[in-house]
Regions:
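Catalytic histidine neighborhood in serine/cysteine hydrolases
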Residues: 220-236
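Flexible "cap/lid" loop of the alpha/beta hydrolase fold
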Residues: 101-109, 115-146
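Conserved alpha/beta-hydrolase "nucleophile elbow" surrounding the catalytic nucleophile
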Residues: 91, 95-100
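Conserved HGGG/HGGXW glycine-rich cap/lid loop of the alpha/beta-hydrolase fold
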Residues: 9-62
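Short beta-strand/loop motif that positions the catalytic acidic residue
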Residues: 197, 203-205
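Active-site nucleophile elbow and catalytic-triad environment of alpha/beta-hydrolase enzymes
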Residues: 178-193, 208-210
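Active-site loop/oxyanion-hole signature of alpha/beta-hydrolase fold enzymes
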Residues: 42-45, 52-92
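Catalytic histidine-centered segment of alpha/beta-hydrolase-like enzymes
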Residues: 233-246
């Protein structure tokens, strides 16, 4: 394990492989091991120095309980703390879901530190009114169940997670996940960053994801973007389908000078 320190919050990360540095950042309730589970690291490490990061509040990173400490700019600065700890001036970045939100934060505050940004299942618009089902605000529903404990939250997930995923989800600290969820729900609109994202960007999303309309819209305002729509996949499916996603990612990265 490796740790960086960002204003007293320790950020856990793992390094695999050699080559140009590539940061991997997971989504809400997840951890860095997911990139290994679904085959991303095994493929990417053949070409890249893969740096998988546990977001604050997740995995082996520190877990503050104050939602203000999960502000997108602060979480973006966690990534910079990892780069600085490893003396890396510039890297590629790939983030899914909450990790995608952090990616927009990096574009806003630290664009000079990245050769490229790969953002999945996320857009820069407000999320408070996100509905995965008509009339149901997704993050409010998630918070309501989390307030009763991780077991209640996990019990409401459909389809039910397998044993490995179940064990992981139940290991989360509910107070930290609540704080991170509140911050994600209440984050401001930063769509004004889109026209400034001049570095090569790949944006991808499953077309059955509730975030798809906003994600499809945001790429219209990005000057240097490759858009990948993944047919038949919802928000939970995409991370697991490295067989579908990785060819797009590898092709995109191979064409960056």
């Amino acid at each position: 394990m490796h740790f960086s320190n960002n204003s007293g919050v320790r950020i856990n990360y793992k390094i695999t492989g050699e080559g140009p540095p590539l940061i991997l950042q997971h989504g809400l309730t997840s951890k860095l091991d997911k990139w290994d589970w679904y085959g991303y690291v095994d493929e990417l490490k053949k070409i890249y120095r893969v740096i998988s990061v546990d977001a604050r509040g997740h995995g082996k990173s520190d877990k503050p309980y104050d939602a203000a400490l999960y502000d997108r700019k602060i979480m973006a600065s966690d990534i910079i703390s990892v780069l600085d700890r490893e003396d890396i001036e510039k890297a590629h970045y790939m983030g899914y879901s909450m990790g995608g939100s952090i990616g927009f934060g990096l574009a806003e505050a630290f664009p000079q530190r990245f050769h490229s940004l790969i953002i999945g299942g996320m857009h820069p618009y407000p999320l408070a009114d996100l509905e995965l089902e008509p009339g149901v605000k997704a993050l409010d529903l998630m918070l309501e169940s989390l307030e009763h404990g991780m077991d209640v939250y996990v019990g409401g997930i459909e389809p039910a997670p397998d044993e490995r995923e179940l064990t992981h989800l139940l290991s989360n600290d509910p107070e930290a996940i609540i704080a991170a969820t509140i911050a994600l729900r209440d984050r401001p609109d930063i769509s004004e960053v889109l026209p400034t994202m001049t570095m090569p960007c790949l944006v991808y999303c499953g077309d059955q994801d509730g975030l798809y309309p906003g994600t499809e819209e945001c790429v219209k305002h990005m000057p240097n973007v490759t858009w990948v729509s993944l047919p038949g996949l919802d928000h939970g499916d995409v991370m697991e389908r490295s067989d579908v996603l990785l060819p797009h990612v590898l092709d995109f990265l191979a064409n960056i000078q």
